[in-house]
Amino acid sequence: MTKVRQLPEEWVYGEIEWAGLNRMEYVDGCDSNFGILKRDVDIAKRLAETKVKYGYPQTYRTSFAKNSNEAIWTIANILHGAGMLKSVTLAMQSMDQGVLQNIHRKNIKFDHFGELVKKYEAAGIPTYTELIMGLPGETLESYIAGVESNLNAGVSDGLFCYMNLRLPNTEQDKPEYVEKYGLRSVSMQAMLTHGTPNPDVVVERQEIIVETAAMPHADWKRAWLFSKVVEIFHAQGLLQQVAIHCHEANGVSYGEFYQSLMMWLTNWSGTLAGREYRGLRILLDGSLDGGSWDCVDHRLGDISWPPEEFAFARICCDLPRFYDEVEAFYDFWEVPIPRSVRDDQRQAIVGPEPGQERDFATRIVWWGRKGAAAKLRKEGLKT
């Protein structure tokens, strides 16, 4: 049985004091369920008080308890009021009740989930949701439906989709569980996120579940590509307003919209967006064969980016071309999209000035993705 281990409060408060006194701009809390203990509210208050006292830490990030409760709402308001909260997690993993039973997980009830999204949004507190692809019992159809459910609930900017890791000493590592759900995993290189590739550093590897009885490998690959397309073009804003219009005005599901986009990207591989989509497919196949996940473009610095951020940032380096070319998708789509919606979408995202690509990628794409700064792409950065 897993027990929660608590560090002495005086030690925790001492660490917070040290961070403030030594002008630590960013502090990442290692709690896996911050907000699950009563004292966590007091710790949040001490963090806010320390920032008032020293001006530091400027930002505090943590992993909140998986089922959002009133304590997390209180903590979020305390940290947000002090200007040091990046965002609040509304973790779902899957939207399918059968899958949740298979992994012994209880989610926030969906009706309550939608209310929470609106509640935090009204308070100006950024939220994000995490889904995991390839869970036992999840089909391609149920996974896409789960992504749609999040978008329908108003999670437009903060959707993150992750692969399913097979970890030692977990239920997914037990032979009888593996056999029951038809789990197949592949040893893949760990993704280096926002780090500089170094050939002298030992490469870490992870066991990733790439097939289940419910999701054949081909479906798993399509689920991953669908996830990346939604993260690039919806969650990061490139076609978000157009997709929302098609959904609200024409009843088009988000799954239908983005799967049609995937078809268009495949057929129009010579476009800027088509090139990035082709790059995603090549990257995935190479990684499945044991290759690296590294995504480096020296315009964006010398670090490796997550695939969805990499594609988004590169498209933003030539936005006029992207929006000119995507007009062909609007015609291919055959759903009426008014010129006003197209123009508003074109104006919603502002890319970097020549020579400023690295700063843009760092400040807006990396630092801004899980926080309020991400909304600057649609609000503060308008021309």
Model-derived segments and their meaning:
Residues 1:
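Local cysteine-cluster metal-coordination motifs and their immediate loop/turn environment
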Residues 45-46, 146-147, 176-180:
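Short, hinge-like loop/turn segments at secondary-structure boundaries
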Residues 37-39, 93, 97-104, 133-141, ...:
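Flexible glycine/acidic-rich beta-alpha junction loops that bind and position SAM and/or redox cofactors
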Residues 207-383:
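Radical SAM enzyme core and accessory elements
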Residues 27-29, 58-59, 157-161, 235-240, ...:
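Acidic/polar loop patches that form or flank catalytic/metal-binding clefts of enzymes
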Residues 8-128, 133-135:
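Conserved SAM/AdoMet-binding glycine-rich loop
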Residues 72-78, 136-152, 219:
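Catalytic cores of alpha/beta
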Residues 60-63, 145-150, 161:
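Phosphate/diphosphate-binding loops
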